[in-house]
Regions:
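ACP-dependent fatty acid/polyketide chain-elongation machinery
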Residues: 1-57, 79, 235-245, 342-356, ...
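Short, well-ordered amphipathic alpha-helical segments that serve as non-catalytic structural scaffolds
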Residues: 68-79, 133, 160, 232-233, ...
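Feature captures the FAD/FMN-dependent oxidoreductase FAD-binding
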Residues: 65-97
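Flexible, low-complexity linker/loop segments at domain and module junctions
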Residues: 85-88, 281-287, 315-318, 367-403
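Conserved small-residue
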Residues: 18, 72, 93, 137, ...
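Condensing-enzyme catalytic core mediating Claisen C-C bond formation in acyl metabolism
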Residues: 22-26, 204-281, 289-290, 359
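Acyl-CoA/ACP chain-elongation machinery
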Residues: 29, 172-218, 251-265, 295-302, ...
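Conserved catalytic cysteine-centered active-site region
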Residues: 26-70, 76, 100-163, 172, ...
Length: 403
């Protein structure tokens, strides 16, 4: 597995900070925020792209590709895979982004207005389009299996992982490198989400701005980074002695068919999605132990996900823990499902549920167990990671304790 995110640039550091409830939310300093309504976010800190790419390579890529490549390289190295002429066509890549090269697009648009089309870089298009993380990973390692990138807003990472698992299940690959990446803390990214009134405006206290299920939550916090996992057919992994973090046992999808940005009333769409994941995993509701929630800290979204859990799990919803790591990382949009798949797998490995920090006054309409402000040691055999996106696109992966 590999990760680059606001609380750490590798799996070990990020997980340690998540379990200890460390916030990665800080004032934004990569752009001038003087005219912005929101001046903070979940930035990646102390990232050194030269650890992963040469200056020549990095120059041809937007920052979202830098993050995706870094997480992908970490995951590939962690897997211990060796690519040979005989297995290359059985290894593929599915790493997406919700928005893609927004920074490069903004800068190129400014350059076009100032100096005309002849000054546009020949690398503008390949440096900014979303599928180039998968493309560059394939080129770097000579991976000749399926090579694609799903784009579904904030569900992107989860859909790439889930669909990659289906590729393996269908027999089209033995191994898939999958996840999501994003770098949208740009002038238009920050300004656009603020204009939609989706973001917290708690500029005076960034660290507590992301407060899922708290009665005073006022929107999500924009974050950047990438999360990538290596999926492998079990017998194939077992034969080569691979380290197995867990089993991706279920995958569910659904559509709200309701509104461009709001969740369906009562969480009905999200509930169907979770039910589909459990059905695919062949487990009953009462076998689920933990949910890594979408949990974005929006007024409508947090209630809808609480209602969805109740609808999907019935009375058992009172027995599970559902926490939001976005309280520490912010919302990484297309990368959210990637980093949260990593956190969910580690929760199962270490038998501990990450906390939801910043719950100071729990909303009475959100009445489940959210592991408020402190990690919870507990039995976790089966866990769901949820992602829900604009357009009513929903995805849930179900990870189970490995054989």
């Amino acid at each position: 597995m590999g990760i680059v995110c606001p609380v750490g640039n590798n799996v070990s550091d990020a997980w340690k900070n998540i379990i200890n409830g460390v916030s990665g939310i800080t004032p934004i300093d990569n752009i001038d925020t003087e005219l912005q309504a929101v001046k903070f976010g979940g930035a990646v800190k102390d990232f050194d792209v030269s650890k992963y790419l040469s200056p020549k390579e990095a120059k041809k890529m937007d920052v979202f590709i830098h993050y995706g490549m870094a997480a992908g390289i970490q995951a590939f190295e962690d897997s211990g895979l060796e690519v040979t002429e005989s297995n290359a066509e059985r290894i593929g890549v599915a790493i997406g982004a919700g928005i893609g090269g927004l920074s490069t697009i903004e800068k190129t648009a400014d350059l076009f207005r100032e100096k005309g089309p002849k000054r546009i870089s020949p690398f503008f298009v390949p440096s900014s389009i979303i599928n180039m993380v998968s493309g560059n990973m394939s080129i770097k390692y000579g991976l000749k299996g399926p090579n694609f990138a799903i784009v579904t807003a904030c569900t992107t990472g989860t859909h790439n992982i889930g669909d990659a698992s289906r590729i393996i299940e269908y027999g089209d690959a033995d191994v898939m490198i999958a996840g999501g990446t994003e770098m949208s803390s740009t002038n238009c990214g920050l300004g656009g989400f603020a204009a939609a009134r989706a973001l917290s405006t708690r500029n005076d206290d960034p660290e507590t701005a992301s407060r899922p299920w708290d009665v005073d939550r006022d929107g999500f916090v924009l974050g950047d980074g990438a999360g990538v996992v290596v999926l492998e057919e079990y017998e194939h992994a077992k034969k080569r002695g691979a380290r197995i973090y867990g089993e991706l046992s279920g995958y569910g999808m659904s559509s709200d068919a309701y509104h461009m940005t709001l969740p369906s009333e009562g969480g009905e769409g999200a509930a169907r999605c979770m039910r589909n994941a459990m059905r695919n995993a062949k487990i009953n509701e009462d076998q689920l132990d933990y949910i890594n929630a979408h949990g974005t800290s929006t007024p409508a979204g947090d209630i809808a996900e609480t209602d969805a859990a109740k609808l999907a799990l019935g009375a058992h919803s009172k027995n599970i823990v559902m926490s939001s790591t976005k309280s520490m990382t912010g919302h990484l949009l297309g990368a959210a499902g990637g980093i949260e798949a990593v956190f969910t797998a580690l929760a199962i490995r270490d038998q501990i549920a990450p906390p939801t920090i910043n719950i100071f006054n729990q909303d009475p309409n959100c009445d489940l167990d959210y592991a408020a402000n402190e990690a919870r040691e507990m039995k976790i055999d089966h866990a769901i990671s949820n992602s829900f996106g604009f357009g009513g696109t929903n995805g849930s992966i179900l990870i189970s304790k490995g054989p």
